[in-house]
Amino acid sequence: MELEHESKRPLYIPYSGPILLEFPLLNKGSAFTEEERRNFNLHGLLPEAVETIEEQAERAYRQYLDFKNDADKHIYLRNIQDTNETLFYRLLDAHLNEMMPIIYTPTVGEACEHFSDIYRRARGLFISHPNKAHIDDMLQNATKQNVKVIVVTDGERILGLGDQGIGGMGIPIGKLSLYTSCGGISPAYTLPVVLDVGTNNPQRLNDPLYMGWRHPRITGKEYDEFVDEFIQAVKRRWPNVLLQFEDFAQKNAMPLLNRYRHEICCFNDDIQGTAAVTLGSLIAASRAAGRQLKDQTVTFLGAGSAGCGIAEQIVAQMKSEGLSDEQARARIFMVDRFGLLTDKLPNLLDFQNKLVQKSSSLAKWDVNNDSISLLDVVRNAKPTVLIGVSGQAGLFTEEIIREMHKHCERPIVMPLSNPTSRVEARPEDIINWTDGAALVATGSPFNPVKYKDQEYPIAQCNNAYIFPGIGLGVIASGAKLVTDGMLMAASRTLANCSPLAQEGQGPLLPLIDDIQEVSRKIAKQVAKEAQIQGVATVTSDGALDEAIERNFWKPEYRVYKRTSF
């Protein structure tokens, strides 16, 4: 009752008239009461009827249904977000399963490609390299003063779409919408940021309406110094903020994470979030088959920072189940465009070197040339798990999937590339090629597959199962860093929420409609692990539960009282 009372306290604000109506965090639209209309000089600026938020949401949903394509639905929802954020999140609460693919993947990819064309209103911060001397001033200009979560991108690797320049801003905006709708983090505490370091995309550079810095991307020392200036400015402005790196190119993603993960509370969702949700899904899938993860043999298509990040988390879990480091790594096969990563390949990246296969262990393999293909690996290594993070459509061919099924009664196939147009194989094909035996999880949403009068649910291995709970756990506990142990706690908690693993039937991952409860559970275990690892103050379980609920924002209108400047 005490927490409920806190949420219903009046909010004292100084704004009135048209200024108040233009403030998305405070605007209630037609839901301003008669008293509020009188006190805040709103009479005549609104229609006569005073409505509830439920009535507003019903109207908004009817309007939403009038749009026939997903891109227009995205623009419509973004317009509501930019005019009345409470209504926006109330609408998402009621229709999250339907609207998540609209506000984020896959539709957000198209919005990023056309960012300058569909631009309506500023949101977040655009930190451009030509203004690098004024980063502190730009952070002071943010309309939100008490920022607790920042999602930042430089727009170079947007989903599977590549360099979109400042169009990449659509990703931090969408991601933070999920922090709020899935993890209960108040929109007043979130800030999307794009670092405008130029673009190498000729379509953007030659577009007369492109709104970003029309310049080739800065690189090397110049780039590193600019990012560092931003990080140091953030530390000065909001020293306790959680910073999420999003959609940075492979050449920058891991170095930035390694450089700053012990300096500021930060993580990279493409590397660590993807790894955490994939690991949670694999633990659950293994349990559903009556096995442990250490019993699986895993092949990856895609050996970039995301793929290698997932692989390292799998190694850590296998070791916790009793394997040695060497034994665990021997069960992981990384394939990229040049073939299987082995100790004979030159010019490997640092994070790839620990995941190579020893050539001596492959001596008896039946292969025809020096480049060992994915099909070669499937034939010889006989994987039980196949994970795609290549960003290339159709590479899980019928021949590869059927070959895998020859030696694996219930293969686990996870084509994780986004958006839908880049998926390695479509779920209906995988189900058909394995005669309904495969357990499939994808990166983008897919409808259930019907095969031989049976319906197969397709789990979306969506990072939204993980990062909102991490954010909530960090805020509730006051954690100073995001550790590997905290990420592992998130994975294991997600696995414990799997209907298939717990009940032997149903989907591999929880329903999206249950994601807020999943986020609460993840937040608690992340916070407890932060305390165990010494990056958060130790409190009781009860105090932690209370902190999580206190920080779990709900889209409800507060009563407003007038104050003066």
Curated annotation (Swiss-Prot):
Its cofactor is Mg(2+); Mn(2+). It comes from the Bacteria. GO terms for biological process: malate metabolic process. It catalyses: (S)-malate + NAD(+) = pyruvate + CO2 + NADH; oxaloacetate + H(+) = pyruvate + CO2. This is NAD-dependent malic enzyme. Homotetramer. A divalent metal cation binds at residues 246-247, 270. One of its GO terms (molecular function) is oxaloacetate decarboxylase activity. The record marks 270 as: Important for activity. The keyword Cytoplasm does not apply.
